[in-house]
Amino acid sequence: MIRLLALDMDGTCLNGRSRMTEETIRTIRKAADAGIIIVPTSGRPLTCLPYRMTQEKGLYRYTITSNGAQVVDLEEKKTLFRMLMKRERVVQFLRECEGLNVVRMTHIQHRYVMEGPLMEVAGRIVYGRDVDGIRRVNDMEAFVEKIHYDIEEVQVYFFSGRTRRKVAEILEGYPEFSSAFGSKYVEIFAKNTSKGTALNALASRLGIAKEEIACIGDSANDLPMFEAAGLKIAMGNAVPELKKKADIVTYSNHINGAAKAIEQYIL
């Protein structure tokens, strides 16, 4: 019997336009009404979770955000688990990136901090009504240097293979960081941060066994979450390595694959 359902957001519960359909939200609500603990498990910071989810009262109590950097109990308004990067070390890293043709972003105190007006505009286009948590700064290094908080995540966007290699070289000097490279950007977290580590911590706190956990995802950052779950469902649009680990491959996010999987395999 499934007691907890961990749901990735982008590429899973959201369609190709980064929107959640009525069918998807209705099916998630049906699972919650059946007593299943719904846990949004996202690479987004808390304040950028999908608007359709946040507007549904009583749909979920716990969140895993910033790829596992934070687990929050919204009812008690407290953080249950966190894995953060030291602010001073992030400042050093950002300083080393100075002069490179990159754009830098961070997740700080559950908010998405973007550097420069162009990235803010792009963020608002992508996130739509989910943008309450976006803040723009002109100089990321100066901003991080002034604050008094440790950092959930850093993202660096680059525009050439040469710059990508240079960023990778810089990261070699930060063994306390983990990183995940895409073709145009790298996500950087505290070492051992993952959706799986966070899900294990939450399940342990709630007394829920691995075989009582189901998860649905689409990306490589969902692989650790799969390791923590008894029932692993990959989207039809998922990366090949996730499909190989899945117990079930559902339809793509363009045709409400997550909703169909919940209806067929969990309820």
Which positions does each model-derived feature cover?
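Mg2+-dependent phosphoryl-transfer enzymes with acidic/Ser/Thr/Gly-rich catalytic loops
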Residues: 1-4, 21, 187-267
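Asp-based phosphoryl-transfer active-site loop
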Residues: 3-17
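Active-site glycine-centered loops adjacent to acidic/histidine catalytic or metal-binding residues
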Residues: 8, 42, 218
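Active-site phosphate-binding/coordination module
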Residues: 21-121
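Anion (oxyanion) recognition and catalysis
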Residues: 29-33, 98, 172, 227, ...
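Short active-site oxyanion
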Residues: 35-38, 59-61, 152-154, 211-212, ...
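Short, structured coil segments at secondary-structure junctions
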Residues: 56-59, 67, 173-175, 228-229, ...
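Conserved acidic, metal-coordinating active-site core of Asp-based
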Residues: 96, 100-216, 220, 225, ...
